[in-house]
Amino acid sequence: MAEPDISSSETLTELQQLRLLYFFCFYHAAPFNVKTLVHSLIPPGALSYLLSTYDILRPWLMALRVREGPVNDISTIVQLYEEIVKTGFFINPPPFESYSQTLVARITTLGRPKLQVQQEAQSEVYQRASTNTQQQVSNVSHGNFKPNSSVNTEPNTSILSNSKYAGIKPFDFQSSSQNPGLVCEQKTFYQHQFRPFSNLPSNKSSPVKHVSPNVKNNSKKTASSVNSNHSSIPSSITKSNISSLDVYGSEKLISSGSQQPGHGMVQTTSDKVNASASLYDRSPSKKDITSSRNTSSYNLGSMRNPSTLKNAAHANPFEGLRFQGSSAVLKEGLNSTVKKTFFDNLNSEKVCPSVSPFLTPDNIASSILYSTASFSRSKPDRPRLNLSLELKLMQNELNKGQLKKQFKGDLRNLADWNNLSLVSSKFPSLPITNLRPDGSFLKHRRFNEEIAYNRQTLEKAIKQLDLSPDKVIQLREQNGVAVNGRVCYPTRNKHSEISAQSSSSLGVTKSLASEVYSSSTVDTISKLNTDKDNYLIKSKKEPIQQKSVSSETTLVKPSSTSSYIDTTNNVLKTNSSFKSSGLTSGPRNEKELLPEGIPTSHNNSETQAQTADVSNIAASADGIYNSDQEKPPEKLDVTKRAFGREIENSNEKELLTSTFLSPSAESQVCLAEIKTIRPGLVPKKQFSVDQNNVISDNTDCSLPKPSNSKLSSISSDGDASSNRMAVPDKSPFVHAAPNSKALTKDSFSTHISVSSLLHSDNEISPIDSTRKDYFTSKDSNLQTLKEDASSTKQAKDSGTNDFDKLISGNDVSKNNSGEEQSRSALKPLISGKLSSCESINLTKDISTVKRKEYFGIESTSSKQPFHDTGSIKIPAKRSFDTIDKDFRSSNIPFADKIKEDGGDKNVISSIHITTELPKSMPVEVPTNAGAQSDQSNVVDSESLNLRENISTSVADVSLSQAGNEAVLSKKACKPLVLIDPFEEKVLKAFNMLSKGYAEYRCQWEGCLANLHSLENFIKHVLLLHHPKSCSVVKCLWASCDMVLPSEEFEMHLRGHLNNIRLNCEVSNCKKCFSNYEDMFKHLQHSHLPFKFTPESFIKIRNGNVKEEARRTRNAYTQKSGEVECFMETCTPIAKPAPANWYPVPPPGFNSSLLSRLTQSNQSKDKIIAALAKRNVYKSFAGLYDSKGKNDNTGYDFDSNYARVGRHGSFILPVSKSVPTPSLLIEGSIVQRKNIKIE
């Protein structure tokens, strides 16, 4: 294909436009006073055209960082204007709209990958053309601006002449059909490079058509002259004609410009130099331009380092500018010593063409903010970056500031990306030069205004969300800024550190704030159970075994204020009216002695570490151990074991602060033994012995003293300094322990009922009577607890005791009386009659069932009637709700089913089932005490083989998930604390997942591909690693060495790929997904009761989800208003950019998105919904072109956004009446103007 003629009209029009662009670079860099003076020197017609064109080119000039100030010499700008006039540009100037359609679109984008090869090949072509034209003579016109009559006007057919445009008539400005070179919409620029005329040797003849390397016998062709009737200059123009035209400028300017011979691009070999050749002079004189180029900032290299332009006389004025659509690059001359620009060294072969590399340092942190689904979870060592940020920047990239020393080849080597992103979002006007690598920054102009606005916004958010005090403190710490002089340090987020320390230690962060409380009414017990149950639902601990220890029980009542524990972060959550107080506060003295001189040292950190796990503290106080090796030999009979379970259930979460034993040597040894066996679980409490030989607890609980007189009347001596309780006059076990000597070491195996201690007038409660009747009916001849221990040992030697057989169903008689007896024995345990229990230890080997109840005992002190069902007496008329059998066999949690049934039912929660329960096993759910019913459902004893059906793992994630899914009734919610299932459920479920985008690493031998989409990963493997040309293929996937035929190899590869999936980590859920987006949707709709939006943590009271929080709709589509996972492409691979490379944004760049969003007093959910409307979807940063699939709803907004690097899309100014999006977000690019996409 023949090379295009550089003397053609299209080529010269292009060069004229580039000269005008060079003029605008100097004009844009001039200050305002210089621009005003230039306006006074230019005629009105030309000035109007220049200003209209400048308005279009100004965004591009701003994107090139051409700042005001470097050019103060008006003579330089005037000289450039004269050169434009001398070329005849204003005779038929192209429409200024063409710049916005072609020139800007090509200059601001990357070129094609083969440009460098074309540049080298084209340089050789120019050398050949220059050599061949040295011997050629061209007749040119003389300086009187009249065409030379000796010029041959006939078209020349020579291969070296302009055979196409030699006889063309002058262009008509009004007719675009006669001027195809000016119709930029239809013009396709040549995909070749043109050497600037300024770099042609001065002794060469006029520019001629390039000689194609394939053309032979060039010597046989004779070159004719090139006349001046080409381009847009008419052949009949005279000096008087030009001076009479207002648009061409004053006669003085024209005449002064025509007095400089010797600088024309067209010269002859004769001594006569045509003065009119200055009309086509493409380079300014050395005398006038040298000094101005040293101060020019039109090029980034010259702006950064002016010393590089020492040889500016030989520099290319169009250096660094090239077209993308035409692949035409204006390269510097062969003799130029100027450095190559970033366009020449940028490795465009490795950059994905649809991904924009134009990213300014001012918006680095903001791009990180918008490239993540939850920006607060990005790690400093591995942030989730925008794909555009994967372009590696070298050292000294920025103009100034502290960041440039930290760019060691990659942006991800920067110090703290979390702080950078948060600082950028809080201070939109903060320039990048004020940021420092450690996350600190220097004060800027609007620092105080933005600090005040952020504080005001934060307080409004706290009031709207009704956050707990700890959450408020955490938010204020995250948004705080410490100022030291001019340096500002954002306060560190200590939430993660506190969570890590709390999860690894047994601190007070997880203890319930409680107070020592005593009551004599059943109503008090009901309130106690209700408040304590709220805490039990939050805990998830391992199953525990019991060794009974005798101790006087002081009832620990949780505070009536709202409190709950976040089991994920192990942080105590409270409402605003609650003050945290641990169960075991510091003692009055640093060291106090236990009985017989057992020292106990108190340390705040140790106390916090011990009191975090309340279950373990209670276990240590009761002698409960988690392993069989640590458990001492059993010395209890069946009866006492059953009683021990009741005490465990009622006091497992309570701290036993005093005991009944006398200070005998045996009891002291027992206390020492407990501390020796499990020192980590024994609370460091402070005991003292008074004159009555009563061991009291001196631990300071730092809680207010109960105001009720009945509560304080139980204290025997009225000593308010110690939380001591004397032995009551009557005890349920007084018949079994007639004297104090009987309360020896074995007395630790006896539990004192909480109800019996707190019951007024020593009245035996129904629970106590049940236990006592069972006790007396089992063995009426028992005299002491030592005899009971011997009977327990015999029962253990003989195998499984009666109670264990009764529970496991191994020794159930076939007659009706045996079944009724077994059901009667099990009913108190399952239905919650004994007490509000968290765990029921069935046998030594049978696992623990975690369950919960929401009901209170009837507020009455009178005795309830009993049904005589053998030896066990159970209160009458207790109603039970039986869960459906189909629900039993399902895998969904119990709370989900109850939620579907209705919100007025009580809930069993925290039950982890690994296998399906038998359909014949109904489970009874207790209702409120006020809802009496005559129905009483029985429990089928045949289905009680819990060894096969119930998992031993109680600490599974499903327990925490199902714990707070209950939808409580209004009546049940009144005495309970407020549950926040949003934070409780969502954070637990989503903390299990990997954050960010998925990564799929190719396991093929020698392949290092790492993709972020399973679809792209499958394409990569099937296309790259499946050689279809071979008949037999060997599999090199990981350790697979199979050799298969080519037609079977694809199915074999797909078998490997099917194993790469994202599995749902929720227990009993076996679904797998190919990307995080589908997995999130699965969790939202299958395992969570509401939508997951990480930006808004709204209080959900009583399980009722607010509709506006659940569904946030989009103005253009029907999608939810959440941020989706849009990392759907592979990361582009890019080599390091040159040292002088600088990121250039597209026209209309503006980085103050958050500042605009927060200017109006919008609520938090509205801001998030507004972000969802602004193209933050899969077309983020130009991930695919406009021909990709559109949205499901059929709208084209997602695919038709103008993005940098996409061909064929131009931005045109339109009137405000045209309905266009008011704000477009293209990754880090924000365009505020009304635009129209074509």
Curated annotation (Swiss-Prot):
UniProt KW keywords: Centromere, Chromatin regulator, Chromosome, Metal-binding, Nucleus, Telomere, Zinc, Zinc-finger
Low complexity biased stretches: 224-237, 702-723
GO biological process, one term: silent mating-type cassette heterochromatin formation
Oligomer and partners: Interacts with clr3.
Record organism: Schizosaccharomyces pombe (strain 972 / ATCC 24843) (Fission yeast)
UniProt keyword Nucleus, yes or no: yes
Protein name (database record): Cryptic loci regulator protein 1
Gene: clr1
Phylogenetic placement of the source organism: Eukaryota, Fungi, Dikarya, Ascomycota, Taphrinomycotina
Role noted for this protein: Regulates silencing of the mat2 and mat3 loci. Organizes the chromatin structure of the mating-type region where it also participates in establishing the 'cold spot' for recombination. Required for proper positioning of nucleosomes at heterochromatic loci and for transcriptional gene silencing (TGS) function of the Snf2/Hdac-containing repressor complex (SHREC).
MF GO annotations: zinc ion binding
Localization in the cell: Nucleus; Chromosome, Centromere; Chromosome, Telomere
